[in-house]
């Protein structure tokens, strides 16, 4: 997706009856030293075999999960030279954003000096588990998914990479929504940037960046809480604690429901303004 204009599909999704329940933050489980695998606390589609009982959210989640499960590893990654343009340098010598194809090319990873790889996607698995340090976090590219809950783990991993003098590659499937949202949030946290400035910086390096509507709203709300002082950035443990203390309805539908209720109670108009 390369357009920066509002996406009609996403606008339509906001009007449809999603159904979503979000649990607490995802905590990494015990895993081999080279790979940290997190538990999936995102909402699961119903096991009800009758499609007529599925909400829109459940039906969409079922399709997305089926696609994720069916994605087989590529028999051979494209040539490193052909992929160089897909490796977007966000912070020189520290942070790179890309699609999954860059991660599949050990030749290009070595050329880029990559030492750590942050995978943001349920369908993604390490291609070179013995050669690079991985953190793999399961999340779907859906508006109702809670990406804020992943941020403390992501930030800690990125800090560890930089403290060791390494270069971290952050990627999802296409390097457009999930991984881009994490990188934008990381710049907000480390550089003290507002959301719009961090997003603009990432887009200058990678013009195709386009977080889905739910992730955008979550990051905007996170920025608002940061500016108000409700959330203290601090170190990652402080951030995780602060996020838990000021728990928000991070997913899109609960966010809209809460804001509309607040508008009704306080007598102001909630226009669902979204900067994209």
Curated annotation (Swiss-Prot):
Residues 86-228 form the Tyrosine-protein phosphatase domain. Induction: By oxidative stress. Its EC number is 3.1.3.16, 3.1.3.48. Residues 89-276 are annotated as: Catalytic. InterPro entries: Dual-sp_phosphatase_cat-dom, Prot-tyrosine_phosphatase-like, Tyr_Pase_AS, Tyr_Pase_dom, TYR_PHOSPHATASE_DUAL_dom. Pfam families: DSPc. Could be involved in tyrosine phosphatase signalling pathways, having MAP-kinases as substrates. Belongs to the protein-tyrosine phosphatase family. Non-receptor class dual specificity subfamily. This is Dual specificity protein phosphatase.
């Amino acid at each position: 997706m390369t357009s920066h204009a509002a996406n009609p599909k996403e606008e339509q999704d906001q009007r449809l009856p999603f159904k979503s329940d979000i649990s607490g933050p995802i905590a990494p489980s015990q895993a081999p030293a080279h790979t940290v695998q997190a538990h999936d606390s995102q909402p699961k589609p119903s096991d009800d075999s009758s499609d007529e009982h599925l909400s829109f959210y459940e039906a969409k989640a079922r399709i997305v999960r089926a696609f994720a499960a069916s994605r087989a590893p590529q028999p051979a990654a494209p040539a490193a030279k052909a992929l160089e343009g897909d490796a977007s340098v966000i912070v020189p010598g520290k942070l790179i954003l890309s699609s999954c194809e860059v991660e599949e090319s050990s030749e290009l990873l070595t050329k880029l000096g990559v030492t750590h790889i942050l995978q943001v996607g349920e369908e993604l698995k390490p291609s070179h588990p013995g050669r690079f340090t991985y953190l793999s976090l399961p999340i779907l590219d859906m508006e109702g998914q809670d990406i804020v809950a992943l941020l403390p783990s992501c930030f800690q991993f990125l800090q560890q990479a930089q403290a060791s003098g390494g270069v971290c590659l952050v990627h999802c499937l296409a390097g457009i929504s999930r991984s881009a949202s994490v990188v934008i949030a990381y710049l907000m946290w480390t550089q003290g940037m507002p959301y719009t400035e961090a997003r603009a910086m990432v887009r200058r390096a990678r013009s195709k960046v386009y977080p889905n509507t739910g992730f955008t709203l979550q990051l905007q709300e996170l920025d608002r809480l940061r500016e108000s002082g409700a959330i203290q950035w601090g170190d990652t443990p402080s951030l995780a604690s602060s996020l838990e203390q000021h728990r928000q309805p991070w997913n899109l539908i609960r966010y809209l429901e809460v804001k509309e209720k607040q508008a009704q109670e306080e007598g102001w108009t909630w226009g669902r303004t979204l900067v994209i």
